[in-house]
Regions:
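Nucleotide-sugar donor-binding catalytic core of glycosyltransferases
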Residues: 1-199, 233-259
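Generic N-terminal initiation segments characterized by hydrophobic and/or small/turn-forming residues
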Residues: 118-121, 207, 217
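Residue-level recognition of short, well-ordered coil/turn positions
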Residues: 179, 217-218
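Conserved acidic donor-binding segment of nucleotide-sugar-dependent glycosyltransferases
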Residues: 197-204, 213-217
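Hydrophobic transmembrane alpha-helix bundles
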Residues: 200, 206, 227, 257-261
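Alpha-helical elements of Rossmann-like donor-binding domains used by nucleotide-donor carbohydrate transfer enzymes
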Residues: 205-212, 222, 226, 239-247
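Long, intrinsically disordered, low-complexity Ser/Thr/Pro-rich regulatory/activation regions
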Residues: 212-213, 233
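A short, well-ordered alpha-helix in the C-terminal region of glycosyltransferases
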Residues: 219-233
Length: 261
């Protein structure tokens, strides 16, 4: 995902692009650089990204609450291997799906509330085609090709927040697959503006919410189209590369205006 973004950054100056995890040291670079920083799910503020003389801008996942003009939000995107041919929305096998970990209680009440609600849905008279898998331990569930197949075959994707952050890769993978997304509120950052998900604040209410969504074909198709549009305009590698280009050009203009060039 990040390599594809980098291909769509269009600036005239020599500029190095560094991919790194938040806890790594910033490497020496020949030219001024921008950073792509990942993996800090605690949204912490790190001065090294704002004080380093060679760093022009930092684009990072999990934007901290403490804002800084040199630090910009970056979508999580999708994990390597999440690839699948597109499947017509009305031809998909599953009405809804979820595949993810289930930690020991009470570590994550959200995930247990989701599991309880999905079990309640199984008792309803109306039965749905679904794929639901809870498992213990990181990377103990589906392979990435299997997971992509489930997501691209789902009309509705249930996307609860991550354990330490309200953000999750699942949300963006569901968006890339054109699913109707049900999720909690998201942070106030640029790419979540006009995000197309159907908001839920309490997963225990899912049994009363999901059936009405699945019955409304017009609503499903509308949100499917909104999701595809949002992905293409806000989170696809092409659109994120264009966003980074705009931010770099704004910075270049400001430097010239203030007499730094």
């Amino acid at each position: 995902y990040f390599n594809l973004i980098a291909k769509h950054i269009n600036v005239q100056e020599d500029l190095d692009i560094v991919f790194m995890k938040w806890d790594q040291d910033i490497p020496k670079t020949k030219n001024k650089c921008i950073l792509f920083v990942t993996s800090d799910e605690h949204h912490k503020y790190h001065e090294k990204f704002t004080n380093h003389p060679n760093v022009i801008l930092t684009f990072r996942n999990y934007l901290p609450e403490q804002h800084h003009p040199k630090v910009k939000a970056l979508p999580l995107g999708y994990l390597q291997g999440f690839e699948h041919e597109d499947i017509n929305f009305n031809d998909r096998k599953y009405d809804y799906s979820f595949s993810g970990t289930l930690p020991d209680a009470p570590c994550d009440a959200t995930r247990h509330a989701l599991k309880f609600s999905l079990e309640r849905l199984d008792t309803l008279e109306q039965q749905y085609e679904k794929f639901v898998l809870f498992y213990e331990g990181w990377a103990k569930g589906l392979t990435m090709p299997e997971y992509a197949d489930v997501m691209y075959n789902s009309r509705v994707a249930l996307c609860p927040k991550g354990y330490t952050s309200s953000e999750t890769f699942r949300y963006f993978e569901a968006a890339r697959a054109g699913c109707v997304i049900i999720s909690e509120p998201k942070p106030d950052v640029w790419f979540y503006k006009d995000a197309p998900h159907i908001e839920i604040k309490d997963w225990l209410k899912l049994p009363s919410v999901l059936p009405s969504i699945l019955k409304d074909k017009d609503l499903l198709n509308h949100h499917h189209e909104l999701t595809k549009k949002w992905w293409e305009e806000k989170c696809s590698p092409e659109s994120v590369g264009a966003y980074i280009t705009r931010e770099l050009n704004k910075l270049k203009f400001r430097f010239r205006y203030e007499g730094y060039e």
